[in-house]
């Protein structure tokens, strides 16, 4: 799988050279300023730290005092998600949590499912900000706010939902139901922290990618946010190619076009180059984040 991923990345590099030329692609950053690239990279690295804190706060008894180890785990998991196709890297999370922290596979899997639902909602909410900003209408912000608070409503109704499920499920399934409960935030305060961290994380990431796309592709606010949404949706849905090669830039292009970007001639060519640069930025941030996490993580012994 690793060799196949490396081969696809190499072909992607050849494709970029053939279509645009690496000099043309990289020159966009030269025009925009390498300082902007550095700022974008630092902000993306910050989202990885926040993502780690969310899990650290989610499982305080198991992860307490070992933030560096958890940061390394999260970065390895994130890198596997990027490099492996069809979201197969997700399977590494419960296995890594079991190995490093002794956390049950069912519990960590349930928690991962809940966090991914948080992620998808926050991703859509963050992208919706671009539409609301572009529209500038009160009704647009009202719809956005209504969508934003949906997770809070769902969490408030979890009690009746679990009681109903306990009545209709067979006894063998009740153990799994208990594990799913354990995967949820413990209380309203824990939910608020997890939800808040998720919103900040994704609003930051989408805003950074939208800024980069607008800077490099000369896109409107709505098209920039649409492109960021399209790229990230392509990575969280099970259509993700190894390292996002092809699918991530295509998602950016489709999202930007859906939100009003030009579809022919120079605007489309500039959008394509900006999409490739945004994709490369995501890959580089993941590689740098993983390398840095290896430096800060202290070696730990396997828990029996």
Kindly give the residue locations of the regions a language model identified.
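Extended non-transmembrane interhelical loops and adjacent amphipathic helices
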Residues: 71-102
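Hydrophobic alpha-helical transmembrane segments of ABC transporter permease domains
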Residues: 113-133
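Residue positions within transmembrane alpha-helices of multi-pass solute transporters
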Residues: 50, 88, 121-125, 284
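Transmembrane alpha-helix interface/packing and boundary motifs in multi-pass membrane proteins
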Residues: 77-85, 229-249
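Membrane-interface helix-entry/capping residues at the boundaries of transmembrane alpha-helices
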Residues: 92, 109-112, 228, 275
